[in-house]
Amino acid sequence: IYSILGAIFIFIVICFGITAKDPFIIPIHTNDIHFTDKYDSSATLLIPAAYTLKDGTIEGEYRIAGKTYGTPTRKERISLHPTKGIVISGKWHSDYGFQQTVLIKNRKIRYHDDPHKRFRRALATVDGQLCILQSCIPMTLNQFSESIQKYCTNAVNLDMGDYGYGWYRKIKFSRIFKYNRDKQSNWIYIE
């Protein structure tokens, strides 16, 4: 138990040293990212993307290698574009993408009715580059959007739930208490 408390203490010190409301910003050094429904332990980047329903299916419409699956649950699609980063639009602009809660579009915050404070993660375009932004403390969606607005052109929420894990190179994204990979059914990845 002391090692867990020590890890939590270090995490809090690091977060509050940055300023609790400022997110961690992790640049992704390529726009060549994809969306997949296959777990790949050898991927350079692998983080949960769209919401996963209790039965393991992916919520909403999504695209893998140019084929569209699922049923739309929102008006907008999040295309993972090879030169533009993320494109938020009513139609697909690439062969890979998913539907998810839009946090920032064209530098404007989208407000949502979600009072729950949770750790948050987003895929965003920051200065023309794709980045992962993650909160240091639990926040509502609106608080998280407000904390990342100054950095982002566009940002979409990424599924964290109780199983928000993943990695980018040597950086590990994990919730402190749970690690239930079997519950996640889709990811953003780089080979």
Label each PLM-derived region with a short phrase.
Residues 2-191:
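Gly/Ser/Thr/Pro-rich low-complexity, intrinsically disordered segments
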